[in-house]
Amino acid sequence: MLQINVKKQLGQLALQANIQVPDQGVTAIFGLSGSGKTSLINLVSGLIQPDEGFICLNDRTLVDMESQESLPTHLRKIGYVFQDARLFPHYTVKGNLRYGMKNVSQDDFNYIVDLLGITHLLKRYPLTLSGGEKQRVAIGRALLTDPDILLMDEPLSALDVPRKRELMQYLERLSKEINIPILYVTHSLDELLRLADRVVLMENGIVKAYDRVEKIWNSPIFAPWKGESEQSSVLALPVHLHNPPYKMTALSLGEQVLWIHQVPANVGERVRVCIYSSDVSITLQKPEQTSIRNILRGKITQIEIQDSRVDLAVLVEGHKIWASISKWAQNELRFAIGQDVYVQIKAVSVM
């Protein structure tokens, strides 16, 4: 576990954080530019020192200002991946990967190289690599130092869209297979949803919220980030069963199920999905003989009048699902808070 309880004055920015990060999974550090995201992970790495407080990793004290104890960066067992790859141009990929290697067997080396899909690059030099390939090598080099935690500072920000998509696939795999915590700095909603288990929401140096991604996403505090064009709901649900003939998977939603296209997940394993309000309609009676597979019972808990539509939040088995309808439909059907309804979900995005 990573424990952070620090204060740091950085010019006009007063950074303050008090969080505990589990010993596995991806924790996103999310916020506007200048909110203190990179400064927070630099405090963990030792590149900057706090004014007050302490940071502990797996019962090791990295820094404690009260006792004036501070481990040098190179002794903290931390892997750091920057926005730019920072590879050594005069070393091959293999040479870059082996630089700083500690307590890593050949089998472990081969595993990391295979995990990141860079086996075919080992004899090449950085100058011949694409941006995405360079970042994969940089990640591999960080992992091969045998770190207790991996820090990633917007590793996709300098890449074009095709390279971002390419690297994202490897990051998704990496996040599921390595058994150390990852602190991942980003201001991308897509990266947040696809990669992170938890999110630290930062604003002007202060931690405004810290919880699982789906809880933060669905909370009012995150509303400004999603914009006003459309509501959305993020759910993390366990696999109930698979239906191979139709290539579909059912997720448990209380006593009901949510059908999605088939995913390679075991029964009981959680899958994160996003449902956009434009893909949801509401009926007063359960529809019969419809092509829509996802029809769920729920109760209206919130109604928001927008310029050109009405947004309704329906509580389904403890989960809030948003639907957007026309003002005409609202005037005709007169939906009200507390009313029992059925939601029809036309599409579900698997994150």
Swiss-Prot record:
<dbReference type="Pfam" id="PF03459">
    <property type="entry name" value="TOBE"/>
</dbReference>
<feature type="binding site">
    <location>
        <begin position="31"/>
        <end position="38"/>
    </location>
    <ligand>
        <name>ATP</name>
    </ligand>
</feature>
<comment type="function">
    <text>Part of the ABC transporter complex ModABC involved in molybdenum import. Responsible for energy coupling to the transport system.</text>
</comment>
<keyword id="KW-1278">Translocase</keyword>
<dbReference type="GO" id="GO:0015412">
    <property type="term" value="F:ABC-type molybdate transporter activity"/>
</dbReference>
<dbReference type="Pfam" id="PF00005">
    <property type="entry name" value="ABC_tran"/>
</dbReference>
<protein>
    <recommendedName>
        <fullName>Molybdenum import ATP-binding protein ModC</fullName>
        <ecNumber>7.3.2.5</ecNumber>
    </recommendedName>
</protein>
<dbReference type="InterPro" id="IPR050334">
    <property type="entry name" value="Molybdenum_import_ModC"/>
</dbReference>
<dbReference type="InterPro" id="IPR027417">
    <property type="entry name" value="P-loop_NTPase"/>
</dbReference>
<keyword id="KW-0472">Membrane</keyword>
<feature type="domain" description="Mop">
    <location>
        <begin position="289"/>
        <end position="351"/>
    </location>
</feature>
<feature type="domain" description="ABC transporter">
    <location>
        <begin position="1"/>
        <end position="229"/>
    </location>
</feature>
<dbReference type="GO" id="GO:0016887">
    <property type="term" value="F:ATP hydrolysis activity"/>
</dbReference>
<dbReference type="InterPro" id="IPR017871">
    <property type="entry name" value="ABC_transporter-like_CS"/>
</dbReference>
<dbReference type="InterPro" id="IPR005116">
    <property type="entry name" value="Transp-assoc_OB_typ1"/>
</dbReference>
<dbReference type="GO" id="GO:0005524">
    <property type="term" value="F:ATP binding"/>
</dbReference>
<keyword id="KW-0997">Cell inner membrane</keyword>
<keyword id="KW-0067">ATP-binding</keyword>
<dbReference type="GO" id="GO:0005886">
    <property type="term" value="C:plasma membrane"/>
</dbReference>
<keyword id="KW-0500">Molybdenum</keyword>
<keyword id="KW-0813">Transport</keyword>
<dbReference type="InterPro" id="IPR004606">
    <property type="entry name" value="Mop_domain"/>
</dbReference>
<comment type="subunit">
    <text>The complex is composed of two ATP-binding proteins (ModC), two transmembrane proteins (ModB) and a solute-binding protein (ModA).</text>
</comment>
<dbReference type="InterPro" id="IPR011868">
    <property type="entry name" value="ModC_ABC_ATP-bd"/>
</dbReference>
<dbReference type="InterPro" id="IPR003593">
    <property type="entry name" value="AAA+_ATPase"/>
</dbReference>
<comment type="similarity">
    <text>Belongs to the ABC transporter superfamily. Molybdate importer (TC 3.A.1.8) family.</text>
</comment>
<keyword id="KW-0547">Nucleotide-binding</keyword>
<keyword id="KW-1003">Cell membrane</keyword>
<dbReference type="InterPro" id="IPR008995">
    <property type="entry name" value="Mo/tungstate-bd_C_term_dom"/>
</dbReference>
<dbReference type="InterPro" id="IPR003439">
    <property type="entry name" value="ABC_transporter-like_ATP-bd"/>
</dbReference>
